[in-house]
Amino acid sequence: PEIATRIAQYELAFRMQTSVPQLMDFSGESKETLESYGTKGADGTYASNCLLARRLAERGVRFIQLYHRGWDHHGGIKNASAGTAKLCDQGTAALIKDLKQRDMLKDTLIIWASEFGRTPMAQGSGRDHHIKGYSMWMAGGGVKGGMTYGATDELGYNAVEDVVSVHDMHATMLHLLGIDHEQLTVRFQGRDFRLTDVHGNVQDRILA
């Protein structure tokens, strides 16, 4: 069985490698699709990667991560943020619209987040890391659309209403993927660990 498993792994790796040229060939995409994403082809831009994400999802890839590097605005935030937002907004919006048009959005969970937010007050020409109150958004499979959950204080500094912890977020994400977070464990150094540790509650009010 171990030899058969190893052979299967090599065969899977080969199939993945040989599928890349077709995956990266955007010539079959319409002009309207390319323009909606804001890309001319597989050029490595964020917009191009958004389109690539849709193509990966069509081929059954279950986890896809996109990222944009340009948000580390410790300086020059006034000049940088508008352009950075535009680059992200167009491709992201096109991806959601494209998935919906293809009847894929209902089966795809989209999570837009970063590891922390930014302070509500400027520090020089930029803003520092901030973990006490920041936003993220979700769309697609199982998520209730058109709603805002939680709130910060009047300064935008502390989360004060319907605060969602990282463990709560993980519990909710796993629930949307059909996984009970209290049953999912990973064994490490003789102990079974949960992703949500001994915490985490599914946030039912954001579920469709």
Where are these regions (language model features)?
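Ligand-binding pockets and gating/stacking loops
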Residues: 1-208
